[in-house]
């Protein structure tokens, strides 16, 4: 880690951080959540009734921290400590980071009622508000305020996080979700057009063509895991974003691909319409540069979540915007194959 990072004061111990916010001696209660990284959450209620959430995380707890090569002090904690100025309306809601034994603790206000519900449908005005905030985040050079040695997520590790190759490794390591990912990729291979199944196997085994294409596009600071459950809509117009564990510098295609596929249970419009609404929010012309971003968003999305599309299609689900999951799988497969042809 660079001297610039080490210029920051040492992480305080957790009691010091809690005392700073009037939470010394306040009991913690377990907080149920929908995350699947392994991080642990508790809620604390201060004497004035204000509620807070404490997130404890470490390499030992968190498989994503391990496989993405996170810093031992965790990149999200480094982000909180540097506290970069984010563009309106985006907010980093964290109040501080501390050391708690072998874990890193992050303190934030309790955003219950502000965060969007996990895997629940949203309406179009809500989607527009999220896309406007996302476009603002991507336009601003906020990431340039962080030192060169900031431990950004490696983009190749991010893209390969959920491939069949990765799932095989997780299963062999005894991680329980490895079998679910493998089962999803098996379903994808059964139900997707053969050309799409072959393309996903090819890119999983050798992602260099995709990575090379991404390297040709401009990069910016990304949240990295923009599930709707990580997005809050505050009454004052602010949009707090939590769970920056996989923040990275990469083309917006990486963020858009994951946004489309990870929020399939909540999005009120088909993927092409959402991409076009984002483009307009970002002020991007509908030109060759955008066409390249769009192609790579499709390829990235299917690489990361083809397994889930296989499971959803096999289950016969219907999506909030009206397509069946099988129709959605057909769209993604067709568009990915066409985008893959343009990679050549």
Residue ranges, per PLM feature:
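Conserved structural core of kinase catalytic domains
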Residues: 96-127
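Conserved kinase catalytic-core helix
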Residues: 117-157
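Catalytic-loop of the protein kinase fold
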Residues: 221-223, 228
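Active-site activation/catalytic loop segments of kinase-like enzymes and analogous catalytic loops
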Residues: 78, 252-284, 299-324
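Active-site catalytic-loop/activation-segment of kinase and kinase-like phosphoryl-transfer enzymes
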Residues: 150-210
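Catalytic activation segment of kinase domains across protein kinase-like and atypical kinase folds
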Residues: 229-258
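Protein kinase catalytic-loop region centered on the HRD/HxD motif
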Residues: 214-220
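Conserved NTP-binding catalytic cores of kinases and kinase-like/nucleotidyltransferase enzymes
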Residues: 1-102, 210-214, 234-239, 338-344
């Amino acid at each position: 880690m660079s001297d610039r990072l080490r210029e920051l004061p040492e992480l305080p111990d957790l009691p010091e951080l809690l005392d700073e916010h009037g939470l010394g001696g306040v009991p913690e209660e377990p907080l149920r959540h929908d995350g699947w990284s392994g991080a642990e959450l508790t809620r604390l209620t201060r004497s004035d009734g204000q509620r807070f959430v404490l997130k404890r995380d470490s390499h030992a707890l968190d498989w994503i921290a391990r496989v993405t090569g996170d810093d031992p002090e965790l990149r999200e904690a480094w982000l909180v400590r540097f506290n970069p100025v984010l563009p309106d309306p985006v907010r980093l809601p964290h109040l501080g980071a501390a050391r708690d034994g072998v874990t890193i603790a992050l303190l934030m206000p309790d955003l219950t009622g502000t965060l969007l519900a996990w895997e629940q449908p949203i309406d179009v005005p809500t989607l527009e508000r999220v896309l406007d905030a996302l476009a603002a985040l991507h336009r601003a050079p906020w990431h340039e305020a962080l030192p060169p040695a900031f431990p950004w997520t490696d983009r190749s590790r991010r893209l390969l996080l959920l491939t069949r190759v990765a799932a095989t490794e997780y299963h062999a390591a005894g991680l329980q979700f490895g079998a679910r990912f493998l089962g999803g990729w098996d379903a994808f291979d059964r139900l997707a057009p053969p050309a799409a199944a072959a393309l996903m196997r090819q890119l999983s085994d050798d992602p260099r063509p995709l990575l090379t294409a991404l390297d040709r596009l401009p990069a910016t600071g990304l949240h990295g895991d923009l599930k709707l459950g990580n997005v809050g809509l505050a009454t004052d117009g602010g949009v707090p974003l939590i769970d920056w564990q996989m923040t990275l510098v990469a083309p917006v295609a990486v963020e858009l691909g994951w946004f489309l596929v990870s929020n399939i249970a909540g999005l009120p419009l088909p993927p092409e319409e959402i991409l076009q609404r984002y483009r307009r929010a970002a002020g991007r012309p509908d030109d060759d540069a955008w066409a390249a971003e769009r192609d790579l968003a499709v390829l990235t999305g299917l690489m990361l979540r083809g397994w889930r599309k296989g499971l959803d299609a096999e289950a016969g689900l219907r999506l909030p915007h009206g397509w069946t999951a099988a129709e959605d799988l057909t769209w993604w497969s067709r568009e990915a194959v066409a985008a893959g042809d343009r990679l050549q």
